[in-house]
A protein has these predicted regions:
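Internal alpha-solenoid helical repeat scaffolds
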Residues: 82-181
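Short capping/hinge segments at domain boundaries that bridge a core fold to an adjacent linker or tail
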Residues: 1-26, 49-50
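Alpha-helical tetratricopeptide repeat
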Residues: 7, 20-31, 56-58, 92
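Structural motif corresponding to the intra-repeat A-B loop/turn of tetratricopeptide repeats
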Residues: 33, 46, 66, 101, ...
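TPR-repeat structural position
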Residues: 16, 20, 36, 49, ...
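The canonical alpha-helical register within tetratricopeptide repeats
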Residues: 25, 45-46, 58, 71-78, ...
Length: 181
């Protein structure tokens, strides 16, 4: 309808630069209203990968493990790899996304990238602590890991928490529905 007409008119009348600016303003409008799905759509249409990345991280912190991965998958997958590799939160998201799509090889690849990121950071480095926290989260929640190692993993993570070496984001990959956890 009318929306399609407006898009057609925009394509006809606006330069590429003006279109990007319009999508950026639209993204900001939705972001301020905390409508991240529409904001992500606008920022993606405008080609603003850094804003997409920033919003995915913010959304992951607002709704950690509450099933947002499936809803946000196309945005995660649209990001350049370098952007994902710079963020522990995005690497964690990619690892879980791949696992939920039963791409366990991809999931373990992103887990490995996150592990390498954590190893490059110092013990007192905030980014390193965040990466180690996200690794602990993945150790507990990745579905391909099964329940066999959990009897060792959970006490080890508990010790890290008590020593304040990690802080765990909350999680429920089943959208807070009952699960094996």
């Amino acid at each position: 309808g009318f929306r399609a007409f407006l898009r057609w008119e925009m394509e006809r009348e606006y330069t590429e630069e003006k279109r990007k600016a319009l999508f950026s303003r639209g993204g900001l409008y939705y972001e301020l209203k905390e409508d991240y799905a529409h904001a992500l759509e606008c920022y993606t249409s405008g080609g603003d990968h850094s804003k997409v990345s920033e919003l995915l991280v913010r959304n992951a912190e607002l709704h950690p493990g509450m099933g947002h991965y499936a809803e946000m998958e196309k945005y995660y997958r649209s990001l350049p790899e370098a952007e994902i590799l710079a963020s522990p939160s995005l690497m964690q998201g990619m690892s879980m996304l791949c696992a939920l799509a039963m791409d366990y090889e991809g999931s373990e690849r992103w887990y490995g990238e996150l592990q390498a990121f954590a190893e490059r950071c110092g013990r007192q480095d905030a980014a390193g602590k965040q990466a180690r926290s996200r690794l602990a989260w993945l150790d507990i929640s990745l579905p391909q890991r099964g329940v066999n190692g959990l009897t060792e993993t959970i006490p080890a993570v508990f010790r890290l928490l008590m020593n304040k070496e990690v802080t765990l984001p909350s999680f429920s990959v089943t959208s807070a529905l009952p699960s094996i956890m």
